[in-house]
């Protein structure tokens, strides 16, 4: 699996799955609003129907139906903003890996707040998320194991408020 940090906009990602996060109780970020607008409101509508709050472990997914360069967008909950470090980062990024496996996505972009030490935690979460102990399993030719080949990490603000602070 190739993992790299990218400076480009998540809107330019052309792979299988784009994952973005929202902190618990936070308003949608400018990126989330842009994506929802590009998807004709599908992302925000599905998040509202699912009562998405950004709590750790929550997620909603929508197909882009050709409206974006990527095939699918998944919004994951990052948990409380003040606890976004260490284990919370690993768990969220492991959720990215599991989402990729569930979608059978080979190329994934994760637009998450990854500044500083969070980048190390993100890499660890990716490795833990894709790990499978298959030594004792018999091979199933009809369902070969999923392989995540590329993960592009894009650093984004944790919340709209954090984005405004960074811009000031």
Label every PLM stretch briefly:
Residues 1-168:
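Short amphipathic alpha-helical segment within the helicase RecA-like ATPase core
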